């Protein structure tokens, strides 16, 4: 499990005190070590500590329902695509820095990943389960490494499947 803990790493920095690495290793990495790589990547990508660590909780599609909401305009808090998690998914978890992706591929994968966030619990600033929030998901088709993904919840699973089957992933 030590290898996978380094491959799908998170840290106790930022607000991750309660999103501890121990819980992450126990609940996600160790629980999936006997699964195939695609399952491991999917489970690690959609794990609440990884979503928090790589800021996908802040990944809101500008054209999404939430992104176009009046309160964002009133409070001057525009919705933004957060590329951090998408870049790490390609660069560190699947196809490597030499995988042939472009900055546009990172942006498009980040759009695929919009809407995935922890389920918040009332009175607390974090959650322990993950949900897909359609209101925060960027609508429309996205193209990553030449493959087109429809809008919606299934996009992340299809994108991960394509990334783990990419020739660069096998070499990485």
Question: What do the predicted segments below correspond to?
Answer:
Residues 1, 5-14, 21-28:
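Peptidoglycan glycan-strand catalytic modules in the bacterial/periplasmic cell-wall system
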Residues 18-172:
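Active-site substrate-binding loop specific to GH73 endo-beta-N-acetylglucosaminidase modules
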């Amino acid at each position: 499990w030590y290898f996978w803990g380094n491959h799908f790493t998170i840290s106790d920095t930022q607000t991750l005190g309660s999103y501890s690495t121990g819980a992450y290793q126990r609940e996600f990495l160790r629980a999936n070590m006997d699964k195939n790589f695609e399952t491991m990547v999917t489970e690690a990508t959609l794990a609440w500590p990884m979503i928090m660590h790589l800021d996908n909780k802040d990944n809101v599609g500008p054209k999404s329902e939430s992104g176009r909401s009046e309160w964002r305009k009133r409070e001057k808090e525009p919705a933004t695509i957060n590329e951090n998690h998408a870049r790490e998914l390609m660069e560190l978890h699947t196809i490597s820095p030499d995988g042939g992706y472009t900055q546009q591929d990172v942006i498009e994968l980040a759009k695929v990943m919009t809407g995935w966030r922890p389920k918040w619990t009332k009175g607390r600033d974090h959650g322990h389960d993950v949900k897909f929030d359609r209101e925060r998901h960027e609508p429309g088709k996205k193209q990553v490494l030449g493959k087109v993904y429809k809008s919606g919840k299934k996009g992340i699973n299809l994108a991960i499947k394509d990334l783990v089957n990419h020739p660069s992933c096998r070499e990485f």
